[in-house]
C-alpha cells in the first residue's frame, strides 16, 4: 500500500474544541433522513450473498439518496450487462475491504475492475473493458447514469471502497462536481492523522468512533460516515440547514 501526498483534512475534523459536532451530525442524520435506508435495506444480503452482483434491491436503495435509475439503464444493468458487471465485481476487492488498504493503482488504472465498472455503468464509450480474461471496450450511448448516480450504486456494492460523489461533498473537498479525483482524495484523507479525545489517530479510526456513537441500525463504514458528515455540514438547502441548526455544537 502506498500513501498519497498529504491533503488538507476538512475543518470539521480539525476542531479540537468542538470535536463532538461531527459525531452529533452523524447521529442526527440517521434520525432524520431517509438516506439511512440506503445502508440498511437488505444489508446482510448486499454484503454477503449478493456482493458480487447488482440487484433490484440495490436500485431501490439508491433511491433513498434522492436519485432514480432510469428505466433503460435498469434493463441494461439487471439483464443486458449483468454478467459483465458480476465479473467485474468478482474481480474487485471484496465488500469488506476499506479504501485505505488498497493501492492507488486499483483505484486509478483504467483496466482495473473498479475503473472498468465505473466506465461501464457510466457508458464511457471507448474506455477499456477487461473481465474474465477478455478485453474489449465500452460501447453504447449514455442512458442517464451520471457520475453521482453511478457513485451511489458502486458505493452500495463496495461501501468501504467507493465514496459518494455528491455535488455538496465534492465541492467541499475542492473537487469538480463530476467527482474526478474523489477516490484518491478519500483514500488520502483516511490516512491523515487527526486529534480526537486527546489522541492522534488516522481519520478512519476517528470516523469508526463516530459510527459507534451514532448507533446506526446497521454498521456503516468510515467512508460512508465521511460522506454523510461532509454532506450534512455543507448542504445549503434550507430544510437541511434548519435541521443542522438544531444539532448540538457550533459551525
Question: Where would I find each of the regions flagged by the language model?
Answer:
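An N-terminal alpha-helical hairpin/helix-loop-helix interaction module that forms a charged
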Residues: 1-141, 160-251
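Internal, hydrophobic cores of structured domains that mediate oligomerization or house catalytic pockets
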Residues: 151-156
